[in-house]
């Protein structure tokens, strides 16, 4: 039984470092995903600017209303391979971040549970020694 307590105590001491390492991974992935999001925004802005600048032979804007511009944007964005790749990368990064947050939550729960168990058994041990 003492071996289990020692293992739990060791695990309890390791968990803060493990949690900290995962938090740093989240920070790095968040920064990387922000860079990807900025690239996405830049490409989308360029597509919108290009659409706004399209004119016919008479110099009249081809996409004169918001609905037409939005439809053209969706079509152009769907055809832009770089944009599609960046969006796929961004979605993957966001998934990784979510999974890391779940991992932190699990480790935090483990930490609370181990602490509670050790406190419970320590208190019971003290009470049994009083008799």
Question: Where in this protein do the model-derived segments appear?
Answer:
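Short, charge-rich amphipathic alpha-helices with coiled-coil/heptad character
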Residues: 1-27
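Short acidic DE-rich linear segments
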Residues: 2-5, 123-131
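Generic structural signal of hydrophobic/aromatic residues within well-ordered alpha-helices
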Residues: 8, 47, 114-117
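Short A/G/S/P-biased low-complexity tracts
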Residues: 8, 15, 120-126
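Extended alpha-helical coiled-coil "stalk/arm" regions
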Residues: 29-70
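Short, glycine/alanine-rich amphipathic alpha-helical segment
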Residues: 56-94
